[in-house]
């Protein structure tokens, strides 16, 4: 748990080291939720209790268990998109979210579903709660739950999406797809039993709506996520620059201008992350918390910068990337021809092919497109993120200047 800005900066370095080990392609490594659980344990008092259990104590004890046993937690908060025009309790299928169907002295039984649970197949536990941007209403009380459960709970089903790897191709042809396909899954609960000791919210709409924000998890998991985002953006930016150089395009002013936009974008994101740390605050529990407004600025902007880096790489690599041969061709009859035809004064044929394969995998393969989609939407609805950023903007200095100018104008007006 960070107590000073130096602690937060140290966590930044740890997040960065983990992200660099996977080139920023794994969005939900264990450090994401583990940092949130550490903070939840400190702030858990708001969870209160009911006639069966002490929710605050449950959160604290679970955090200790996670730390002691090095538990990898995945999470699922988004409800399936079935009918957004109806309240969640008015959708008859029972799969519009996860809801309590029975409770007794030992715990609760839940059924329902959550979508886009990343890393579920390899995680140990699953944390379930509701998204803060889609608030529950009073009639939704059975859906007002937050709990943790092992993913091997007999009542939990993991339904994975289609794989994006290429098992018949080598890792040289698909260096990302064949190594870093982070699996997303649809999670179904079928009368799954959750003991009270692992329940943090139950039958309490207000607490369900407050859980992610008031727990402090949002700010601290956002910090981890944006450090990972920097790493991913740095890979995409560096790849565009390397492509331009290897293909002999970096001497043209127009290309340099495109690349300069990418490097400027990267610096802006790095600077904003630093601002989130330097302008953080010590909360009432003594936790040094990053500036969420700065982090949300990154979340609303980084996906577009990442998208731009991919598009620049596509435009520069173009036909060279689309027509790149399988690396297996270098072991066949065409090896001599390819070595002669594709070698330049800037790269051997094999180096050029490896680079173009990487460019295709990141920008144009199914894996690459999933990564782009993930970057846009994994942090929540981009429209809501920007609307909330506007609502929380601190423009006191700007408004004071406007008021001063208007006041000066009035003072010089003869009525």
Features from the language model and the residues they span:
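Short, charged, amphipathic alpha-helical segments
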Residues: 253-260, 288-296
